[in-house]
Amino acid sequence: MTAFIPLLRPAAVLLALASAASAALADSRAMPADSMLPAYRQECAACHMAYPPGMLPAASWKRMLSGLDSHYGSDASLDPALVRQIGTWLEAHASTYKRVREQPPQDRITRSVWFERKHHELNAAVWQRTAVGSRANCMACHTHADRGDFDDDRVRIPK
C-alpha cells in the first residue's frame, strides 16, 4: 500500500490543478472590464452594460453588428470602420465553449440556454421590480457585472 503513496501525491496535485482550471474556464464568459476594447465599452455602454463577449457565440455578435440600424428597437448605427473593429474584437472573444455554443433566439443573452439555467429559480415577478427593470439589466443583481464579475456569492436581488 505504501508503494502507491508517492504516485498518489502527484496524481492528487494534477487533479487539483485540473479542477481549478476547469472552474476558471466554467466562468470564462466573464471578462474584466479593463480588458474590454475601449471602442466597444464607449459605444455599447452608452446605452446598456457592455456585456462580456463570451456571453454569446461569434455568429450572434456578427448578426447583431450587421443590424445596428435596428438594434432592439433603437438605431445604434456606427461608422463602418468602427463596426469592423468592434466586430473583430467581439468575434475573437466570443464564446466558443460548449456552454454557450448554441445561438439563442433573436441573439438575446437573456434567451440563451445557459442564462435560463442560471436564472430558472427566480420568480417572474423579480424581473418586473422597478429596481430590476428587465432581464437584460445584469447590474441590478450582479453588483460587479460592469467589472465582468458575475459570481453567485455577490448577487443581491433588489426587493
Predicted regions, residues:
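Sequence context surrounding c-type heme c attachment/ligation sites in exported
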Residues: A26-T88, A92-K159
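Bacterial N-terminal signal peptides
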Residues: R9-S22
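N-terminal secretory signal peptides that target proteins for export/translocation
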Residues: M1-L7
